[in-house]
């Protein structure tokens, strides 16, 4: 486990608790995604380390225009603790906790070519049956897979790609 994730964990849990209490999961997701993207930019990361940048200015820089008072206070706490650079990890932890609370499995389906909606619906139905939860699918295309697909749910990876099958075949022949 990386040190950044360890340091970000209490902030991710705090953000989740505030959003759950206010019933504002989606706005917090949007705000954290915005702030994480901004904080993840190398130029902004360097700026955040500059002592000439005040905490209020840092919060203003990282807050989305529609941010509520709770979110601005949350960013202020991160700024006070000099943890604004952890926003990408905080956002990831928050999304994981949100998915758990909403009984949703987030899956990334990477295929060699674009998949039809029918194929994605079939995969979603199979994953829902396997995990007993709703499925939120994100797609990606990677031509190096040659054919097939790789399904990544975070905890479980199902490699049905030709590239993966060839690698397993090569490994078994080598032993």
Curated annotation (Swiss-Prot):
Keyword match RNA-binding: no
Record's keyword terms, sorted: ATP synthesis, Cell inner membrane, Cell membrane, CF(1), Hydrogen ion transport, Ion transport, Membrane, Transport
Main localization, broad class: membrane
Matches recorded under Pfam families: OSCP
Recorded topology in the membrane: Peripheral membrane protein
Entry GO MF terms: proton-transporting ATP synthase activity, rotational mechanism
Family matches, as InterPro entries: ATP_synth_OSCP/delta_N_sf (IPR026015), ATPase_OSCP/dsu (IPR000711)
Cellular component GO terms, alphabetical: plasma membrane; proton-transporting ATP synthase complex
Protein localization: Cell inner membrane
Record SUPFAM superfamilies: N-terminal domain of the delta subunit of the F1F0-ATP synthase
Family: Belongs to the ATPase delta chain family.
Quaternary structure note: F-type ATPases have 2 components, F(1) - the catalytic core - and F(0) - the membrane proton channel. F(1) has five subunits: alpha(3), beta(3), gamma(1), delta(1), epsilon(1). F(0) has three main subunits: a(1), b(2) and c(10-14). The alpha and beta chains form an alternating ring which encloses part of the gamma chain. F(1) is attached to F(0) by a central stalk formed by the gamma and epsilon chains, while a peripheral stalk is formed by the delta and b chains.
Functional description taken from the UniProt entry: F(1)F(0) ATP synthase produces ATP from ADP in the presence of a proton or sodium gradient. F-type ATPases consist of two structural domains, F(1) containing the extramembraneous catalytic core and F(0) containing the membrane proton channel, linked together by a central stalk and a peripheral stalk. During catalysis, ATP synthesis in the catalytic domain of F(1) is coupled via a rotary mechanism of the central stalk subunits to proton translocation.
Record's protein name: ATP synthase subunit delta
Organism the protein comes from: Xanthomonas oryzae pv. oryzae (strain PXO99A)
